[in-house]
């Protein structure tokens, strides 16, 4: 039944849900995934990045995922390491995020926000939109960066026994989704609606976070609504699974590059105790480059460049 739903949704299309023009990635693009739990948990699956890679396999594109559980457009999850009994505030997190993003020099940024902010209620929608505008202006590099907005995921009614609470959560998420759609339209950026197509699918681990099937369906929706070209090979093929494993490993290496487990010794309150620890994250760079080379070589073997 779940697979049938996946097939039906992948075939469903409407002008309302699609961008006016098709979206494309070009040679040399640096694609960034920025947001909260949606993107951090995507690291475990790799479906979205694989879908994009297979559709632009003859282009040399770099992907970086800096999603952070619980993050908001205000940078709440990205505050500095603890200094004695004090954590940094959201503004510090926002500035750290901006600095990190600029260092990566992205040309395309996929944004996933709204879920965490929605717990503030519908009354906080104006503040959310203001924060979103500020984020775009801060990271947009005077129009040089192309953005893609993703809506929040829906909540599953099967995991919420109280119908009234489910109705309230759904209404709130829809309000934040419409805010995202409005800002995207105002700034003329693509918007991908994940609320409506995924509303009735059993695609989550707990009613909130997507599982592997969920991320596969999400990748299908992104491709459909952005009118992406067909993949060079089917995403369910054995070769695609090999590619997905390569992508997951590369993303794991980059995760440890920018978010080391010994954060306190690298960036936080104990960084003066073990200075050698501050040099260790950069050592992941060579492994990341090597893994990306494997990915490009594998793509050439299954999808040679078009003449």
Predicted regions and their residues:
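Mature catalytic domains of secreted/periplasmic carbohydrate-active enzymes
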Residues: 41-69, 73-78, 82-87, 91, ...
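Active-site segments of SGNH/GDSL-like serine hydrolases
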Residues: 112-117, 136-173, 195
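Structural recognition of the beta-strand scaffold that forms the well-ordered cores
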Residues: 30-34, 62-67, 107-113, 146-151, ...
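Extracellular serine-dependent O-acyl
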Residues: 146-153, 170-203, 216-238, 254
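Oxyanion-hole/transition-state-stabilizing segment in secreted/luminal serine hydrolases
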Residues: 24, 34, 44-46, 76-127, ...
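Conserved catalytic region of serine esterases and O-acyltransferases that act on ester linkages
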Residues: 26, 202-307
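Solvent-exposed loop/turn segments at secondary-structure junctions
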Residues: 37-41, 68-74, 108, 115-120, ...
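Serine-esterase "nucleophile elbow" of acetyl-processing enzymes
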Residues: 6, 13-70, 74, 97-105, ...
């Amino acid at each position: 039944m779940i697979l049938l739903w996946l097939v039906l949704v992948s075939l469903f299309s409407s002008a309302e849900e699609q961008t006016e023009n098709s979206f494309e990635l070009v040679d040399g693009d640096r694609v960034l995934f920025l947001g909260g739990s949606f993107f951090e948990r995507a690291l475990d699956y790799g479906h979205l990045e694989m879908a994009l890679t297979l559709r632009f396999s003859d282009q040399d594109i770099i992907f970086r995922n800096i999603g952070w559980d619980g993050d908001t457009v205000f940078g709440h999850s990205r505050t500095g390491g603890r200094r004695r009994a004090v954590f940094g505030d959201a503004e510090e997190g926002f500035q750290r995020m901006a600095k990190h993003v600029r260092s990566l020099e992205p040309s395309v940024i996929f944004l996933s926000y709204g879920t965490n902010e929605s717990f503030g209620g519908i009354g906080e929608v104006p503040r959310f939109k203001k924060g979103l505008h500020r984020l775009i202006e801060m990271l947009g590099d005077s129009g040089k960066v192309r953005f893609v907005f993703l809506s929040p995921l829906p909540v599953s009614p099967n995991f919420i026994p109280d119908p009234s609470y489910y109705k309230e959560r759904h209404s709130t998420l829809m309000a934040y989704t419409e805010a995202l759609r409005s800002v995207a339209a105002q700034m003329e950026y693509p918007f991908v609606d994940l609320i409506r197509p995924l509303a009735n699918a059993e695609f989550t681990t707990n009613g909130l976070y997507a599982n592997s099937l969920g991320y596969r369906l999400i990748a299908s929706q992104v491709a459909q609504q952005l009118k992406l070209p067909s993949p060079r090979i089917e995403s369910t093929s054995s070769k695609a699974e090999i590619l997905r494993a390569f992508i997951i490993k590369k993303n794991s290496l980059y995760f440890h590059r920018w978010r080391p487990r010994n954060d306190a010794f690298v960036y936080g309150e104990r960084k003066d105790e073990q200075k050698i620890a501050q040099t260790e994250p950069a050592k992941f760079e060579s492994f990341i480059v090597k893994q990306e080379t494997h990915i490009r070589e594998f793509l050439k073997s299954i999808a040679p460049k078009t003449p």
